[in-house]
Amino acid sequence: MKNTSRMIFQVAVGPQSNLYAHCIESVSNYCDKHDITHHVLTAPQLWIKPDPFNSGRSEESYMKYGGYLPIYEKENAFNYLPEFDQIAIVDADIYIREDAPNIFDDMSDDAAFGAVVERDMPIEDWYKNKIINYSQMQYGQLHSNASDFRPNELGFEFCNMGLIVLNLSLIHI
């Protein structure tokens, strides 16, 4: 895609660790290098609090962010859909190397959505076990003949939502 408007959206609400600050800075530098708008949401807007009785989440997992889960704040990126041709939603703990190519240039023009199927990544054995357990916990009850999550020896197929790329010209809103 030529002459497109692009944005990387990140969520960094609540107390920030040195890791998050370092990673967000790497994304900012990457955006400057590739002429990409960079937006970091630093104050929650949705304030979605999980139900600890139904979610199985520990209280500590969301109280450290003020009583809600920042993952839901990623949805605020959708507010920018009319303004950009492409948007990437990037977790605040992802570091982008200085020599990384422009991810938008690697996104196929005929793909509306890009993400990583986590089990297909080159991963260590200890992490394979983590993915198998996680996917079984999340998708085991949902899997049926009506909805196929394509299970294999590494668990169910799911995308790691830490990096999402959207080609908005192919998404009808």
Predicted feature locations:
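N-terminal anchoring/stem segment of glycosyltransferases
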Residues: 1-62, 69, 73, 82-83, ...
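Hydrophobic/aromatic beta-strand patches that form the interior of the parallel beta-sheet core
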Residues: 9, 39, 88-90, 114-115, ...
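A residue-level signal for conserved active-site and pocket-lining positions in enzyme catalytic cores
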Residues: 31, 78, 93, 164
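A conserved donor-nucleotide-binding helix/loop in the catalytic core
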Residues: 51-90, 96-105, 112-115, 159
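Conserved donor-nucleotide/metal-binding helix-loop-beta segment in metal-dependent transferases, i.e.
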Residues: 98-134
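Short, flexible, basic/aromatic active-site loop/helix in glycosyltransferases
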Residues: 135-155
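Short glycine- and hydrophobic/aromatic-rich loop-to-beta-strand nucleating segment
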Residues: 157, 162-166
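Conserved small/polar residues in nucleotide/adenosyl-binding loops
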Residues: 172-173
